[in-house]
């Protein structure tokens, strides 16, 4: 479901978006603070107010949790054990897509750490999120808007596939797959494989919300219709993808420490990290 439709449904059912609104920040954590100072050239004494102002403007139009809770300044890509490899490969010319990139904040981390912007792409179903990324990072002259593509990953006719099918070396997916049920996740995974070069070493890196207690999760499905994996279901997903596509993959997974899970209302939630490599 498109995020606009999800929001409208929630509001219709009586959801109060103020519940998603966190009090203004008094500090901005690293690495975003340094990125805004050195990459975006925001004066040191203006960083906090700049972030708060962008959040408030965005939330007035798009009252989503990722905006209200300042998730866009909580970067995670560098926490992945695959980050060093992703960084070195993109420095050498390999092409990376951040799928479901929101404000494109993880792309700015890669640029700040030395990746040429021309080797990076971002895609989100919400064009306004891509535009808000420019309001936050003030870097349209550094990261051309041609590198950011508004598209639905389920639409094989979209600009994303017209431009990048078979062209990418790495696709990064963070906290995105859970909005789809299991069957649609299979389709998403197959579509992502179509974006990658059909050669050994092409890689998907994932950061996935997972749940140890699937019975607790099942009880919440009506009011929170997300599909949170456990390790068994995650492995089953990629086994099914290999079966349906005939593509051989190597899947490695791990539990990844993450501040996000401390805020989650359900017990047993954790972050599952994974790399999926084409053999």
Swiss-Prot record:
Pathway it works in = Secondary metabolite biosynthesis; terpenoid biosynthesis
Q: What's the domain of life for this entry?
A: Eukaryota
Entry EC number(s): 2.1.3.-
Spell out the Gene3D superfamilies in the cross-references.
Vaccinia Virus protein VP39
Top-level enzyme category: transferase
Q: Where does S-adenosyl-L-methionine bind?
A: 124-125, 152-153
Q: Name one GO biological process term.
A: methylation
User: Which SUPFAM superfamilies does the record cross-reference, listed alphabetically?
Assistant: S-adenosyl-L-methionine-dependent methyltransferases (SSF53335)
Name one molecular function that GO assigns to this entry: methyltransferase activity
Q: Which key words are in the record? A: Methyltransferase, S-adenosyl-L-methionine, Transferase
Asked if the keyword Kinase belongs to this entry, the reply reads no
Where, by residue number, does the polypeptide cross the bilayer?
Answer: none
Q: What function does the entry list? A: Methyltransferase; part of the gene cluster that mediates the biosynthesis of paraherquonin, a meroterpenoid with a unique, highly congested hexacyclic molecular architecture. The first step of the pathway is the synthesis of 3,5-dimethylorsellinic acid (DMOA) by the polyketide synthase prhL.
The record, for PANTHER family, names: METHYLTRANSFERASE AUSD
Q: Which family does it belong to?
A: Belongs to the class I-like SAM-binding methyltransferase superfamily.
Q: What is this protein called?
A: Methyltransferase prhM
According to its UniProt entry, this protein's organism is: Penicillium brasilianum
């Amino acid at each position: 479901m498109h995020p606009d439709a999800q929001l409208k449904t929630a509001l219709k059912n009586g959801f109060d978006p103020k519940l998603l609104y966190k009090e203004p920040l008094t500090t901005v954590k690293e690495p975003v603070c340094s990125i805004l100072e050195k990459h975006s050239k925001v004066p040191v004494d203006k960083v906090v107010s700049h972030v708060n102002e962008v959040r408030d403007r965005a939330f007035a139009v798009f009252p989503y949790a990722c905006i209200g809770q300042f998730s866009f300044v909580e970067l995670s890509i560098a926490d992945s054990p695959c980050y060093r490899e992703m960084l070195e490969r993109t420095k050498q010319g390999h092409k990376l897509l951040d799928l479901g990139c929101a404000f494109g904040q993880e792309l700015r981390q890669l640029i700040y750490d030395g990746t040429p912007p021309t080797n990076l792409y971002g895609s989100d179903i919400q064009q306004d999120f891509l535009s808000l990324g420019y309001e936050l990072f003030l870097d349209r002259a550094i990261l051309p808007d041609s590198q950011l593509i508004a598209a639905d990953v389920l639409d094989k006719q979209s600009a994303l596939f017209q431009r990048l099918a078979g062209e990418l070396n790495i696709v990064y997916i963070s906290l995105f797959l859970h909005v789809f049920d299991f069957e649609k996740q299979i389709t998403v995974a197959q579509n992502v494989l179509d974006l990658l070069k059909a050669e050994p070493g092409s890689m998907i890196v994932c950061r996935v919300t997972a749940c140890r207690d699937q019975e607790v999760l099942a009880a919440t499905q009506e009011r929170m219709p997300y599909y949170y994996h456990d390790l068994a279901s995650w492995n089953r997903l990629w086994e099914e993808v290999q079966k349906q596509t005939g593509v051989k993959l190597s899947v490695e997974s791990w539990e990844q420490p993450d501040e996000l899970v401390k805020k989650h209302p359900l017990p047993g939630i954790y972050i599952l990290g994974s790399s999926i490599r084409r053999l």
